Swiss-Prot record:
It comes from Schizosaccharomyces pombe (strain 972 / ATCC 24843) (Fission yeast). One of its GO terms (molecular function) is metalloendopeptidase activity. Heterodimer of mas2 (alpha) and qcr1 (beta) subunits, forming the mitochondrial processing protease (MPP) in which mas2 is involved in substrate recognition and binding and qcr1 is the catalytic subunit. Catalytic subunit of the essential mitochondrial processing protease (MPP), which cleaves the mitochondrial sequence off newly imported precursors proteins. Preferentially, cleaves after an arginine at position P2. Its cofactor is Zn(2+). This is Probable mitochondrial-processing peptidase subunit beta. Binds 1 zinc ion per subunit. Coiled coil: none annotated.
Length: 457
């Protein structure tokens, strides 16, 4: 028999490492610095986010933000394009950028000893970009080819049309790339003016995650970004800029009978980033779920809609979405089907499942909450993901919710919350419809709208 008294005593000789916290500092010029320090990390990601994307453009310069993203790595007043590339290749660092409707983001992922240089390069790119006339002409051709490729992608076209019809007459309804005529006509002066108007210190954040400490990044930010000037009328981070868009119940259809599929998006007005029911809308999205017929376990998914679609072969795939902006959002579903004779059935069962959200069961809500937790929290598995999360939250809400707070907020959602939000957001509300491809079988707008005009549950 094992004698427990002879076993060595278990003595804890270390302290549990405290969870990393987000530290925030605002410089004198209004620029915000936020960090999550991981002292044992050997790399760090530093991100510079600008609270300006295609929404900050006019009809004349629509496409400027994306154009500048292309020009970012083509050289500065201090570094040629070749020097920029060599500087990062020699240190093993990674540099990238992307543009959305409300933000433009530049970030660098580097080893610990190369982080200060990465910050210097990011500052050089954002504040000293040369934007030569020859580089503008070269990138113009690249962007035109990119637009040609995007125009061949049904999902991109559908979602651009969805924004255009839902936010008619508002900058949020414009595309990120801009129309072809703008791409062909934007000048160096137009791009420099966009930088002057929007790349202001109070509209920028620097976030990091990994090896660099908060104090060190603040010093680097003061050194390389301290000379930037704020806007004439300063707004706090996360504050809406410009008029709130009016959601318009409407549709855009682009019928192409040569297409093998119908591609359809249906949406209601969703939640902004700051809306108290933001997470409830995400839970509702998870209840509706995503489905693709290539998924081997599709008959056993928790989504009721996926079961119906799979059993009756109504679609190739569907994807629910909850897209948020500073003062509005789009909540809906994207459907792809080659069963063109049953499009009406597909739309009917989709909206019927939207209606069922007012009577969602506790089991459905708890399962969706678990899926949402996994989606939001398990994705924070790298310094780049964490830096992006910090930057996005600061730009959209003005503060960062810790993973623990996110988990708590999701955990507090009940089936009553889902029923209330579904009733307020979906029932008898206008919808925006965007459809591309072989859509002869998609019935008229009023027929689709009437499916959610009466609550029978």
């Amino acid at each position: 028999m094992l004698r427990l008294q002879n076993l060595p005593k278990l003595v804890r000789r270390f302290a549990t490492t405290a969870l990393p916290k987000t530290e925030t500092t605002t410089l004198k010029n209004g620029l915000t610095v936020a960090t999550e320090h991981h002292p044992y990390a050997q790399t760090a990601t530093v991100l510079v986010g600008v609270d300006a994307g295609s929404r900050a453009e006019t009809a004349k310069n629509n496409g400027a933000a994306h154009f500048l993203e292309h020009l970012a790595f083509k050289g500065t007043k201090n570094r040629s394009q070749k020097a920029l590339e060599l500087e990062f290749e020699n240190t093993g660092a990674h540099l990238n950028a992307y543009t959305s409707r409300e933000q433009t983001v530049y970030y660098a992922h580097a080893f610990k000893n190369a982080v200060p240089n990465a910050v210097a390069v990011l500052a050089d790119i954002l504040t000293n970009s040369s934007i030569s006339a020859s580089a503008v002409e070269r990138e113009r051709q690249v962007i035109l080819r990119e637009q040609e490729e995007v125009d061949k992608m049904a999902d991109e076209v559908v979602f651009d049309h969805l924004h255009a019809t839902a936010y008619q007459g508002h900058p949020l309804g414009r595309t990120i790339l801009g129309p072809k005529e703008n791409i062909e006509s934007l000048t160096r002066e137009d791009l420099l003016q966009y930088i002057k108007d929007n790349y202001r210190s109070d509209r920028m954040i620097i976030s990091s995650a990994g090896s660099i400490s908060h104090e060190e990044l603040v010093k680097l930010a003061e050194k390389y970004f301290g000379h930037l000037e704020p806007s004439a009328e300063q707004l706090s981070l996360g504050a809406p800029r410009g008029l709130k868009p009016r959601f318009v119940g409407s549709e855009i259809r682009a019928r192409d009978d040569d297409s093998p599929t119908a591609n359809i998006a249906i949406a209601v007005e969703g939640m902004s980033w700051k809306h108290p029911d933001y997470f409830t809308a995400l839970v509702m999205q998870a209840i509706i779920g995503n489905w693709d017929r290539a998924m081997g376990a599709s008959p056993h998914l928790s989504s009721r809609l996926s079961t119906i679609v799979q059993q009756h072969q109504l679609a190739n795939s569907f994807m629910s979405f909850s897209t948020s902006y500073s003062d509005t959002g789009l909540w809906g579903i994207y459907l792809v089907t080659e069963n063109l004779g049953r499009i009406d059935d597909l739309v009917h069962f989709t909206l019927q499942n939207w209606a069922r959200l007012t009577v969602a069961t506790r089991a459905e809500v708890e399962r969706a909450k678990a899926q949402l937790r996994a989606s939001l929290l398990l994705s924070l598995d790298s310094t780049t993901a964490i830096a992006e999360d910090i930057g996005r939250q600061l730009l959209t809400t003005g503060r960062r919710m810790s993973p623990q707070e996110v988990d708590l907020r999701i955990g507090q959602i009940t089936e009553k919350d889902v029923a209330r939000v579904a009733s307020e957001m979906i029932w008898d509300k206008d919808i925006a419809v965007s459809a591309v491809g072989s859509i002869e079988g998609l019935l008229d707008y009023n027929r689709i709208r009437s499916s959610i005009s009466m609550n029978r549950w």
